[in-house]
Amino acid sequence: MGNDKRVRKPEWLKISIGANERYTETKRIVESHCLHTICSSGRCPNMGECWGKGTATFMIAGDICTRSCKFCNTQTGRPLPLDPDEPAHVAESIALMKLSHAVITSVDRDDLPDLGAAHWAQTIREIKRLNPETTTEVLIPDFQGRKELIDQVIKACPEIISHNMETVKRISPQVRSAANYHTSLEVIRQIAESGITAKSGIMVGLGETPAEVEELMDDLISVGCKILTIGQYLQPTHK
């Protein structure tokens, strides 16, 4: 950490976005409903593959985040007001895409009194109303550790609630803006204690050691996390 120089990617790592029929249709549905996805906001290198298969991770509560985590490419600043039609638009898009499993995430909304919790809950309820056979996985922010706000999401009853630890304890303060390692563990504990499947994710490639990753995994097990994803950090390019 601490080196801002962008590293040129090897040719074998580069992929073509592609533009098959499913990709074009997914793009049309997302844009026609004025929705955001973490795929495009985060400049995800897998967007072509996922959209080409008709899947996308919807990002609610706008596309401007109140935090500025160093690993993330999502825009930071003063967000716009919430769109009251967004929950319905997300649910309609999921129906049009015929998704059997929907994944939703959001920017952080530290500017709102409830940090976006009610909007989260309404989105989940609308998805379930319009898509009763679709399972719902939500990747939530920490809501500043406020249990009553996390409980609003829990009571909407998604099948999986995920909150990413992102990295190991030592590196967390350097890359996670306004987040806290132990607060995140308590968020996951609250999810697990509710009976909903608790999930988390981390990146490797930030300077962590194998022992530190094992320590993090032990911490997650201790609070009841059932699913962990581990990905390789790839720095977004400017274009």
Question: Where are each of the predicted segments found?
Answer:
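Flexible, acidic/Gly-rich N-terminal and inter-domain linker regions that tether
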Residues: 1-67
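Iron-sulfur (Fe-S) cluster-binding segments and ferredoxin-like electron-carrier domains
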Residues: 48-59, 71-89
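Catalytic cores of large soluble enzymes that bind and process phosphate-bearing ligands
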Residues: 14, 18, 82, 115
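Fold-independent oxyanion-binding glycine-rich loops
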Residues: 41, 47, 62-63, 75, ...
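N-terminal small/glycine-rich loop or linker at the start of catalytic domains
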Residues: 64-72, 193-199
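Conserved AdoMet/S-adenosylmethionine-binding subsite of the radical SAM
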Residues: 86-96, 100-102, 106-239
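Residues that scaffold the ATP/ADP-binding catalytic core of kinase and kinase-like folds
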Residues: 47, 68, 72, 171-174
